[in-house]
From Swiss-Prot:
Lineage: Eukaryota, Metazoa, Ecdysozoa, Arthropoda, Hexapoda
Keyword line: Repeat, WD repeat
Record-given protein name: WD repeat-containing protein on Y chromosome
Stored PROSITE patterns: WD_REPEATS_1, WD_REPEATS_2, WD_REPEATS_REGION
Pfam family, one: WD40
Name of the encoding gene: WDY
Alphabetical list of SMART domains matching this protein: WD40 (SM00320)
The organism's place on the tree of life at top rank: Eukaryota
Length: 1059
């Protein structure tokens, strides 16, 4: 980390510039001066080598090299700096995986079986055109008793059959091996009966079709290979080491005269070509003992087709052997043999795996050792991996031979790193869930990267599963991320999580610089287990990292050297919720109800167990903050809602408030044990930040839930996060402290003794949500809030809670250009509607950044980037306007970010895959930068497209002018709808049937009658015919009046009024 972290250019970093001879010259200069140089002498020495730095660059370089914080540079310090720089430039040094290879839980697919499973295989789907689909097919399990079961892809039963000897119907079989033949729709079984039984599996039928009998010895291992443009081959090995290959030609038909549908063919007939559909190639006795495994391999070198076979030494044979015999052989398929390689292993080989890309051959046997072979030098294994305590029965390779998985007889799996030749993981859960004393079989599914292990039950577990990049970008940690910090000295990001990992990131190129695993540990029930990291901070020079854990332990880390310098304990099993490094003091607090002070360095610590400050909280301390102005002040808040201001210089409290009633001041207790001055504890149980069930936050449909005023007053509130504004002076008329309540409100305080509560505003727009973390920039212009539902909001606070004479005019058009959220919407979203009635602050941005709780926010002023961490195990990068850059630790890389400027306008921004489908239109608008490419409108003339800005502009001017809708040249004629299909409702009023209430003494009839307006009749001098038409209209009006009904049932008030 040392070299890449300096502010100098890459060509001026020491480890990249100096040569080996120049390092020797530096060593001679240090040796001549007692192995140490002053900082000025070191600068002159580097200048002689051609390395020149400015004052700021050299000051940063000295802080990185000089870990002793003195005026001298030791040779050991410079050498450590160079070594760390070389390690950081190694591309393989930071590829350490956070998750172990087998990290998930075991998934039980089959419960306890009647017959123990000895073989698991997968039969893919083969279509009529010869194409193969590995995503469709059947799982097949076999028992020693010959019970064969077919299962669907999700392990639902499909077919159950039994294999019995073809000639001895009443005798029991003992199955040795099975193999499916997918292209022939057949299944091959071999047992102790010295015969090959081939069953036809079509349409849920399991029928015996072919029996190859009279084999010299029982077949113990089989392998099958098929393809569209090649014949199907079955490779077999027997108890004496003979290897034979059967080639199937289904296009060759044979007519049989017998009545039986089963064809019986002897091995000699197949060898002599008497049965045309099957040919046999006999390779002879290539191995001395029982063949345990055979496998076809791809072309190696100039040889097109090969196979590998291995044999285990028979312990029952007591014959003396003068010279070692081969236990594994690589042989060509063609005869005479073009290539034959023999490997001699003591006690034989039971299993092997081969990787054609790098020609890596791995073997395991009863001697419990894994051997890695170079096939071009078979005399001696290149590497021997020792670690198993029983015979190895199964192994496979992953990621082009980078990892080896091996399973032994005790059902313990070990994962090995081939490159570094070290053990990565020992997984022993199979030994606890499977019955003891019964061998287990295994099958590795390359497509799903899953391992199937079966005995009396069947379990499936994932082995380094691949990330589905269409649904997620991956993860940064293996458990929720709790702390996110930015180191200005090294210009790196540091994240800590509940997995007890400390990871240093180069966020510009998405690279892990340092990984510290098991940073905090404890021994429980005799087992060393990691402890969750809950708080962290840097020292003033940002050279040291202080972390606090859930068990109450504190550790000081050297970021440059990646070592733990000191370990402190505030209290046993006491979660640390806040740590601060002030000058030479360390302040820690948590669930111990008080602040504990330590000396930063052990030689200066007069109180090894810490100096406890006066107790002012009646419950656990949830959050704390330290002001950046003078005089130094620290604010702490407990679960009961007690907010206490402390003077850092003296450690004395000077103000105490209640978050539920912010305008009332609580008395300060100056004696221990004054329970009458303490606030009563909350009755609701306390939970950690990430322990809220997801179902409790999922079903949120309302904008806001309003509680009754009485319950609102009785409810005790606690502050979830505190934030000081460092640029604001300590004055009574200025809001300098923000605190987020658990009901979604944000309170504003002044930490001046004459200040107090200044106001509050609503910071959420979803019911039940709350603000978990707060952050701001150096100039205190913006306030960033992160909520429990994953939303990130940006507020403009520069002009809020300050005196009127200091307020100024805000350039809102410039902010609208910077934040796409401020663009007009046809229908305002919930975020805008919730903040519409608030006078201050101004909501600039709101979008969903995570699917889970946001636990930390950090803003980088130089580059304008906002980093967020969440309980969904991710750390994400955003621009100030809300554009998504990437996820730290993701396999999806992004363009390298500039060092000191924001990303350019033409930067390739993306949308998180997990947020593409289920987000609001407001979040989607922010993620797209105000451009909606999926919703485009055709223009009238040119046939072009109109963007969202054009649509919004048209919607804004809709009140001024509404254009006429163009039709086919003439207005539509009545009726517009086809009345024969859809009958229009009657235009007369629909009157309900009224049921009179007989409890009243009188009925208010006329009060509830609907009266139609009566139009006066006009008397004119018309003809008799015209007068007759008027009288007809009058009669129709009278008929409608007679059909009148009551409108509504009478009420009590109406009845009293009538009386």
């Amino acid at each position: 980390m040392a070299g890449r972290l300096s502010t100098a250019d890459a060509d001026r970093e020491i480890h990249r510039f100096v040569t080996r001879e120049q390092i020797d010259q530096l060593h001679e200069q240090f040796r001549a001066r007692n192995n140490r140089l002053t900082l000025d002498e070191l600068r002159e020495l580097l200048a002689e080598l051609g390395l020149f730095y400015t004052e700021d660059e050299y000051r940063t370089l000295c802080l990185q090299i000089n870990t002793d914080h003195d005026r001298y540079c030791q040779w050991d310090e410079l050498l450590s700096y160079l070594i760390l720089g070389f390690q950081d430039d190694d591309p393989h040094a930071v590829k350490q995986s956070l998750d172990p290879p087998i990290a998930g839980d075991l998934c039980v697919k089959l419960r306890r079986q009647v017959y123990n499973i000895v073989k698991v295989d997968f039969c893919p789907m083969v279509y009529y055109d010869g194409s193969i689909s590995w995503s469709q097919g059947h799982w097949i399990t076999t028992s020693r008793e010959g019970v064969i079961q077919y299962w669907t892809e999700d392990w639902k039963p499909a077919l159950t059959a039994r294999s019995v000897p073809s000639s001895l119907k009443r005798s029991k079989t003992w199955v040795l091996d099975t193999v499916p033949l997918p292209d022939l729709s057949m299944f091959c079984v071999t047992g102790l009966e010295t015969e090959l039984r081939l069953y036809n599996v079509v349409a849920a039928c399991f029928t015996l079709k072919l029996v190859i009998e009279r084999l010299p010895q029982p077949i113990s291992a089989m392998a099958y290979r098929f393809g569209r443009d090649e014949p199907s081959r079955l490779l077999t090995g027997d108890y004496t080491g003979h290897i034979r290959m059967f080639v199937f030609h289904p296009e060759r038909k044979v007519t049989t005269s017998g009545e039986s549908t089963v064809t019986h063919v002897s091995l000699q007939d197949v060898l002599h070509g008497a049965y045309p559909p099957v040919e046999c190639v006999d390779y002879g006795q290539l191995l001395p003992d029982i063949v345990r495994a055979v496998q076809f391999v791809e072309s190696v070198g100039n040889v097109a087709e090969l196979f590998i076979a291995c044999a285990e030494e028979n312990p029952l044979l007591s014959s003396a052997r003068g010279r070692p015999r081969p236990a594994m052989v690589i042989h060509s398929l063609d005869l005479p043999a073009i290539r034959r390689i023999k490997f001699c292993v003591p006690r034989g080989v039971t299993c092997f795996a081969f990787e054609p890309s790098n020609e890596l051959l791995v073997s395991g046997g009863p001697d419990c050792d894994l051997r890695l072979w170079d096939i071009h030098r078979p005399e001696k294994p290149s590497v021997v991996l020792v670690g198993h305590t029983s015979s190895i029965t199964f192994l496979f390779l992953q990621d082009a031979g980078e990892k080896i998985y091996s399973l032994d007889q005790r059902k313990i799996i070990k994962v090995w790193d081939v490159r570094n030749r070290v053990l990565l993981q020992t997984f022993g859960q199979f030994s606890t869930v499977l019955v003891k004393g019964v061998p287990a079989c295994a099958y590795y599914n390359k497509r799903a990267r899953e391992l199937v292990v079966a005995s009396n039950k069947l379990f499936v577990t994932a082995c380094c599963p691949e990330i589905a990049l269409d649904r997620t970008d991956g993860e940064s940690h293996t458990k929720p991320v709790s702390v996110l910090l930015y180191n200005g000295l090294y210009r790196l990001v540091v994240s800590c999580g509940f997995d007890s990992f400390i990871i240093v990131w180069d966020h510009r190129v998405n690279r892990k610089m340092t990984i510290i695993t098991e940073a905090h540990t404890q021994i429980r029930n005799g087992v060393l287990e990691p402890v969750e990291i809950t708080a962290a901070c840097f020292d003033g020079k940002e050279q040291m990292l202080l972390t606090g854990a859930r068990n109450g332990s504190l550790k000081i880390w050297n970021i440059g050297g990646r070592t733990c310098m000191r370990t402190i304990q505030i209290e046993e099993d006491c979660e640390v919720t806040g740590v601060f490094w002030q000058a030479n003091r360390i302040l820690a607090m948590g669930w111990n109800h008080r602040v504990v002070e330590f000396a930063a360095f052990a030689e200066q610590d007069e109180y090894p167990r810490g100096l406890q400050w006066r107790k002012q909280h009646s419950d656990d301390i949830l959050c704390a903050a330290v002001s950046g102005s003078e005089p130094g002040v620290m604010a702490t808040c407990s679960y009961a809602g007690e907010l206490v201001f402390w003077m850092l210089e003296t450690g004395q409290p000077y103000r105490r408030y209640d978050a539920t009633n912010p305008r009332t001041r609580l008395p300060i207790s100056f004696r221990e044990g004054r329970a009458d001055l303490m606030k009563p504890r909350k009755l609701t149980p306390r939970r950690s930040l990430f322990q809220m069930p997801p179902g409790q936050l999922a079903h949120r449909r309302l904008t806001r839930i309003l509680m009754p005023s009485g319950l609102e007053q009785m409810r005790q509130l606690s502050i979830q996060a505190l934030l000081f504004l460092a640029m604001r002076k300590m004055l009574p008329d200025r809001g300098t402290l923000f605190g987020s309540l658990d009901n979604g409100m944000v309170q504003v305080w002044s930490h001046h003794p004459d200040g107090g509560f200044k106001g509050q505003f609503n910071g959420i727009h979803m019911a039940g949500d709350r603000i978990i973390t707060l952050a701001t920039d150096k100039a205190n212009r913006f306030l960033f809030t992160g909520t429990a539902l994953g939303y990130v909001k940006t507020w403009y606070i520069e002009n809020c809670w300050i005196p009127n004479e200091d307020k100024f005019h805000v350039n809102k058009p410039a902010l609208r250009i910077l934040f796409p959220f401020l663009l007009n919407d046809v229908v305002p979203g919930r975020a805008k509607r919730s903040a519409r009635a608030q006078v201050k602050p101004w909501l600039l941005n709101s979008y969903q950044a995570h699917r889970a709780c946001v636990t930390g926010l950090t803003y980088l002023d130089d580059t304008g980037l906002l980093l967020s961490c969440s309980s969904d195990r991710t750390v994400r990068l955003w621009t100030l306007g809300g554009r998504y850059i990437g996820l730290l630790g993701s396999p999806v890389n992004w363009q390298p970010l500039p060092m000191a400027v924001p990303p350019p306008a033409d930067y390739r921004f993306r949308i998180p895959p997990d947020l593409q489908r289920e987000v609001s239109f407001t979040t989607l608008k922010v993620l797209r930068g105000g451009k909606d490419s999926s919703r485009t409108a055709r223009t009238k003339s040119g046939g072009g497209t109109a963007t969202v800005g054009d649509i919004v502009g048209v919607a804004a001017d809709r009140s001024k002018h509404t254009p006429m809708i163009e039709t086919y040249g003439s207005p539509l004629a009545e009726p517009i709808l086809n009345t024969a299909v859809l009958k229009l409702p009657s235009k007369e009023p629909m009157l309900q049937t009224i049921k009179l209430d007989r409890t009243y003494p009188s009925f208010p009839l006329y009060r509830h009658m609907v009266a139609f307006p009566v139009q006066p009749l006009k008397r004119t001098n018309k003809t008799v015919e015209e007068n007759g038409s008027d009288w007809n209209e009058l009669e129709q009006l009278l008929e409608r009046t007679k059909a009148l009904q009551f409108k509504d049932a009478p009420s009590d008030a109406d009845a009293e009024g009538t009386q």
